[in-house]
Swiss-Prot record:
Alphabetically ordered keywords of this record: Coiled coil, Membrane, Mitochondrion, Mitochondrion outer membrane, Peroxisome, Transmembrane, Transmembrane helix
InterPro entries the record matches: Mff-like_dom, Mff/Tango-11
Protein name: Mitochondrial fission factor homolog B
Ranges in the topological domain labelled Cytoplasmic: 1-219
Localization (cell): Mitochondrion outer membrane; Peroxisome
Basic and acidic residues bias (residue ranges): 115-130
Family the UniProt entry places it in: Belongs to the Tango11 family.
Coiled-coil regions listed in the entry: 184-214
Entry's transmembrane regions: 220-237
Amino acid sequence: MAEINRMQYEREYTEGISQSMRVPEKLKVAPSNSGVDPKTQPDMPIPGVFMEVPERIVIAGHSEESLFSRPSNLDFIPGANIAALALKTPPRVLTLSERPLDFLDLEGPAPATPHSKEVRSSGHLKRDGLASENSLRQNGQLVRHDSMPILRCGSSTSVPVTHHDNPRSAMSTLDTTLDSTPDDLALADAASLRRQIIKLNRRLLLLEEENKERVKHEMTMYSIIIIFGLLNSWLWFRR
């Protein structure tokens, strides 16, 4: 009985709340203009935030064509030739027999530009300067010993002092030749790496040819041994 009374009370309570609850027409955000009644001034706009969602988005420059113009393809690059963008299927087998890796050396030399000539000359000077610097460092004692004046018996004359300045002048010339940009070193390293790759390619081709010859030789030897064994067995059975 108590449970029935409780359920009836809760139902009447919820009905009363639903009937007496009202949704306000507006929600005040700030207390500004709190003393002014908006009903007395209908022309004054009520401060608030209005959000409008557009029906569609049109790119600028295409609104005059039609009411619902199709947007342009953004992935397409204007001014590009469509035929040039076609992709070719790669070959299934890649071989070096038709065109080896050192085909650049077989072709005619590329026209040398003044910049490339300067880079090559600077690279050669740098390598020569490094070699001469190493030789001077290794033979520094010999140079100093040779540059020292030699005194003979009964004579007070000596070698002129200008010989002492020879190593200094050589080192100064080396410093001037070693002053260059890192791009020259990169180009020299790329050229040496390219030569090493070409040499490795040639060695690989020679090894492949030797391997093919060895396989052929082994096949012929195995076939001769098998034929010889078959002939011996046939002659033995004939006896």
